[in-house]
Amino acid sequence: MIYYNRTRIYIYGQYKNIPRIKKGHTMKLNIRLTAAILACASILTSASACSSQNASSATDSKNESSIAESSSAESKDNTKSDTTSDNSSASSESTASSDGSSSENKKPVGVDGVQTNGQLVVDIDGHTWGISLYGGGDGANYASYLNEFKEKVGSSVNVFNMVVPTAGAYYLPEGYEKYNASHRDSINSIANKLVNVINVDGYAALEAHTNEYIYTRTDHHWEPLGAYYAAKAFCEMAQVPVKELSTYKAETIEGFVGTMYAFTEYNERIKNDPDTFTYYIPSTDYTATYYTTDFKVDEQFTQFHSIFVDQPASGAYSTFMGGDQKIVKIETANKNGRKLCIFKDSYGNAEVPFFIDSFEEIYVCDIRYFDLYAPDFIKDNGITDVLFTMCTFSAVGENAEGIKNNLLSK
């Protein structure tokens, strides 16, 4: 199954970016189309190989629940520890990893599991989940781009990295491990490659709260509650104030059915078990100004100064700033001299409300849609802190190339 939007193609469970022309640059159309065709061909070849591997490894053509149930019985007395968590060494600027009892080894029991288009639909504790299966990766390019960025902005700017896992890291049921790579391995690999970039252990921050509603079941994103715990870990590392969740005003959107419905080829089980999406409004006063991706005032938003945009239930995750293709500047009532620039994917959107209590100014920028030379942007706006925050799929995949092609390209 193939899904297309303006900048990405979704093919058999993988994302692939469409080549994008940065404003002020030119590219011959035939080159752009050729690149897109080659990219798609590569993904299709990979997907075909993956499908063949899955087919050959399955011993029963019935749904995956039989695999899960038999594997569950075998694993109860034989739980293996995550060797990467046990053996990983953090640099002096990295947070400590969680202890050896990783949630990737404490699997829930799932029933009626079905794999579709690189996604798993499975019932866990009475609710249906859609879980994206993770292919893994060492994030070498991502880490090298952050190191290059840090070198260009110099010692006067604090640069942080916080890569977070998707739901499969914690909630993939027993019996499906062979279809899913370790998020912890990828996050550790990135952390170990960073030079003078401060690592925030987003995995551990979320792992401590897996018994709470921190991920959506019907969407590939997290719940804002999960974003709060990650944002709190970053603020503590950055040594800025962070308020307790009880100081925020909770707003709820019922009946949210997100992207997993389409990703699973419109599985009715996903549609019939929607999420409750709860987001949190900070008490600190602020004003948001919306800009285009080349930092011109967006005329569509000149009268709008909130970071929350009313959405129907189907678009609940777009409550945060209405989406990604923009730069948002937030001026808060804080006067601590700390100015934060967030370079993120869509996961980062849900973190933004939790930084309003902590920084004087915040600039929200998406690595996929940024038409300026980022080191100059940091200098020109007097930014003191930069946070790269995104999910593992982005950090080890094509989205990371946006850092090189957009942020670090003049």
Residue ranges and their predicted role:
Residues 29-53:
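Sec-dependent N-terminal signal peptides of Gram-positive bacterial secreted proteins and lipoproteins
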Residues 2-26:
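Short, Lys/Arg-enriched N-terminal segments with co-localized hydrophobic residues
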Residues 23-24, 29, 49-69, 74-410:
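Extracellular glycan-modifying ectodomains
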